[in-house]
């Protein structure tokens, strides 16, 4: 789907920007082919080095391709807006507006601006995330867990772009927060165990008194799901696959449940099953659910979950694009939501998939939640 959309937008850019240039056909032709190749670079690279999910080419090459691809998308979108405006000017018979919109330098200038903005976006996508602190009120939280601190990492996407050096910085920043518990809500890695072993090794240094609990996202399935599960556990993580664990303090309990990702269906693996995950759990203990995708929040709330932590959306990547991502994820894209008595938090994520690695106005994050007790009003 991404390649088809990219190809259509590339053809549009060639038609509206490259072809009108006052250059010889011998120059416009290669330029046009270069733009089309850029739109299809995911498939081209995957044919020779790695996969669509995990391009195994040098970091600098990924960054250059990501910058060009993002610029292509931004340029195409602005061109569409300009052409709609030009059509409106024609219909309204506004010659001055038509003249302004037809200036020969306008579209190439937009292209240059798109390239510069994209370079900035890729630099932000590769930046070490900053820490965001969030207080969460949970009804009748046991007093033993008042002030309990949970650090969430999600969408780390360790890869040839976000290497072990970057992961180590994320881990160091996380450990500096001194949380009580670390949870990782999927998409830890892009690629095979052999390709990413060194890049994920720093995750073994994550530490918290109550440990590190992880679930899978969709990208673990694109790599080697069966091999990654024991690899994560060797790094000291407790991986929840439609299961739960219990945190105990002074006789009180907190249930941490985790479900798999729906993409499991493609691979004949277990689909998300919250009922199974909560089987045997104390019904009086508050439930924190780790669910990579936020779109099942309403169904999860109906089953008594107090707090759902998700990722997957990357916050929408770019301001404005978040509205499209929101529609594809049940109306949830970034930050906190009150969902039928449950709190849902959708993290922007720490990293990004190398195939679309831009962040413009949507910063990455490491999230630290402080749990607070909320007493239910009488009569509820």
Where are each of the predicted segments found?
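Non-catalytic terminal accessory segments
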Residues: 1-127, 376-378
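Soluble catalytic domains of enzymes that build or remodel membrane lipids, polysaccharides, and related
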Residues: 132, 137-380
